[in-house]
Amino acid sequence: MTDHARPHLIEFPKLGLSDIGYISVAENDDKLLPFAIQRIFWTYYTPESIVRGRHAHYRTQQVIIAATGRITVTTEQAKGDIQTFQLENPQVGLYIPPFCWHTMLYSHTAVQLVLASQPYDEADYIRDYNQLRALWQQA
């Protein structure tokens, strides 16, 4: 395992006007994303009592965006570094590096859009928190 960047917010350009609406764009050749997008997925209608995530990845990097609603993301990295982020602006994304445990809570109206650096591969998921802690200790 190598040392990776910390979770951090990325602000995408906001183009438009209040009377016509706005657009924000993420492209593979811009300097905002630290990876090329290989997969995009979204979640919606998640009950407010459900905690999603509860995993980390070996290789995959992600940017989580609250397209609508509010998402509370809690991240944990090696050495107990815990951060909590409130996502509620569609022009702001949260970068999640590999080996970063993360959980999400949603407002009922939240639509979560995720940009990912890898295609889906179940073998890339670390779903056991104790296994991740052991990997952190080996680093």
Language-model-derived ranges and their functions:
Residues A110-D124:
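A short hydrophobic beta-strand segment most commonly corresponding to one strand
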